[in-house]
Amino acid sequence: MATIAIIAATSDRNLVLAQRFAEVLEDDGHRADVIELADMDLPIFTTSHSKEHGAPDDLDALWSRLEAADGWLVCAPEYNGSTPPTLVNAITWLSTRWQDFRALFNGRPVALATSSG
């Protein structure tokens, strides 16, 4: 069966949604890995911060968990007509860490879900 990384971009309704998806997937025999971005130490990305401090330790863990999954499910609310800062920041860190970050994203099935309100 498949391994699905479920990315919870916030720690409220979308985390509950992510946990519910995990239950359903596991009941169907899949492996689910709920990734709580709000609990990860990913400071706001800036070039100066990156040069001065390097990449945060949690970035390696995030990369590994995403790379190990066959597909991703992103649970994120709409924030002011866009995506939440936690999700944008995580993607930004991922895109600056490795020589070919696109290999992590290309060809991987991704689904989106939201609970907003």
What are the residue ranges of the model-derived segments?
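Short alpha-helical
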Residues: D12, M40, G81-S82
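Hydrophobic/aromatic beta-strand patches that form the interior of the parallel beta-sheet core
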Residues: A5, I35, A111-A113
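N-terminal beta1-alpha1 ligand-phosphate binding loop
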Residues: A2-H30
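Helix-loop-strand module that forms the ligand-binding subsite of alpha/beta enzymes
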Residues: G54-G117
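Cofactor-binding loop segments of dinucleotide-utilizing enzymes, especially the Rossmann-like FAD-
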Residues: A9-S11, L37, S115-G117
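N-terminal beta-loop-helix "entrance" segment that forms/cooperates
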Residues: L37-P56
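Short N-terminal helix-initiation segments at or just after the protein's N-terminus
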Residues: D12-Q19, E52-A61
